[in-house]
């Protein structure tokens, strides 16, 4: 089934070229189907790339989704044209009286700041509070996961001596959890972080369950409130070349950045990346949508 997006959204062309089934809002209105309402709070500066990454994954399920893109009203985005935001995005104020089946909160390149130093922190707190009663399930990614764990449960983040950067092996820690349905016991996921949350802090919160972690990269998947809140510290949504682009960008800035681990063939940045996370990335998003959104949401929101 398709994802419903604006016919002029640039990501639409990318998805159609990859045979991802997309549908315009105009066509969807002619069908007698109650599509799932999914909001994506896009905190990334690379808005269009993030749109394509997430839409690619949530569009790869049998469910019909009506996608709403959100940006922060209290933050000025400098890396995306204002016309793009005006045309395709809403703010929290626009939708705060609505209910949603699912919400995705992305990462953001602000992790070296304390949460309270982030210029849109107060607005984000209001959105996270709103999600507790107006969203069936919320998926938090990377910094968004750190923010959610901190706001909802008081779980702190800690600076790392070296950036966790690359593709890492993870182990499933809880069997028979629907979010991990179909997962191998060992699976890969990308990480790109300067900070971490610690397993010991997660285990001190009785409402949280650690689902998967990595010896090298630490905590990856955590679930809370019977699936109403899902936290992914890694980036299973990343495209094949995302880590490569981050690596090359930082080198051009003159930063001392290591080659992303377990990513390039023969660990040689002149060779192509090896994608080892795509199947489990698709499983993660499809399981979230099926078991924690579709199966749990009421027909009338």
From Swiss-Prot:
Designated name of the protein: Homoserine O-acetyltransferase
Active site per the UniProt annotation: 142 (acyl-thioester intermediate), 235 (proton acceptor), 237
Entries under HAMAP family matching the protein: MetA_acyltransf
E.C. no: 2.3.1.31
Family, as annotated: Belongs to the MetA family.
Pathway note: Amino-acid biosynthesis; L-methionine biosynthesis via de novo pathway; O-acetyl-L-homoserine from L-homoserine: step 1/1
GO biological process: L-methionine biosynthetic process from homoserine via O-succinyl-L-homoserine and cystathionine
Keyword Cytoplasm recorded: yes
């Amino acid at each position: 089934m398709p994802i419903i997006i604006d016919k002029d959204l640039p990501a639409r062309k990318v998805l159609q070229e990859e045979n991802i089934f997309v549908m315009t809002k105009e066509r969807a209105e002619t069908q007698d189907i109650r599509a799932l309402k999914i909001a994506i709070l896009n905190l990334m500066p690379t808005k269009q790339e993030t749109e394509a990454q997430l839409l690619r994954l949530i569009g790869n399920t049998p469910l019909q989704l009506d996608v709403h893109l959100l940006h922060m009203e209290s933050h000025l985005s400098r890396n995306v044209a204002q016309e793009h935001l005006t045309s395709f995005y809403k703010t929290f104020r626009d939708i705060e009286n609505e209910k949603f089946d699912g919400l995705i909160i992305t990462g953001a390149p602000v992790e070296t700041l304390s949460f309270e130093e982030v210029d849109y922190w107060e607005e984000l707190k209001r959105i996270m509070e709103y999600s507790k009663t107006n969203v069936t399930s919320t998926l938090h990614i990377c910094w968004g996961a750190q923010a959610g764990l901190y706001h909802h449960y008081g779980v702190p983040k800690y600076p790392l001596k070296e950036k966790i950067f690359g593709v890492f092996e993870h182990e499933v820690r809880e069997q028979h959890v629907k979010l991990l349905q179909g997962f191998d016991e060992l699976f890969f996921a990308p990480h790109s972080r300067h900070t971490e949350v610690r397993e010991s802090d997660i285990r001190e919160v009785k409402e949280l369950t650690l689902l998967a972690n990595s010896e090298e990269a630490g905590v990856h998947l955590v679930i809370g409130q019977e699936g109403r809140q899902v936290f992914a510290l890694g980036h299973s949504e990343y495209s094949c070349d995302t880590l490569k682009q981050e690596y090359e960008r930082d080198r051009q800035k003159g930063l001392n950045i290591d080659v992303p681990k377990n990513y390039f063939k023969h660990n040689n940045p002149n060779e192509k990346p090896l994608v080892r996370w795509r199947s489990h990335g698709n499983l993660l998003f499809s399981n979230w949508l099926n078991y924690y959104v579709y199966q749990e949401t009421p027909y009338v929101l």
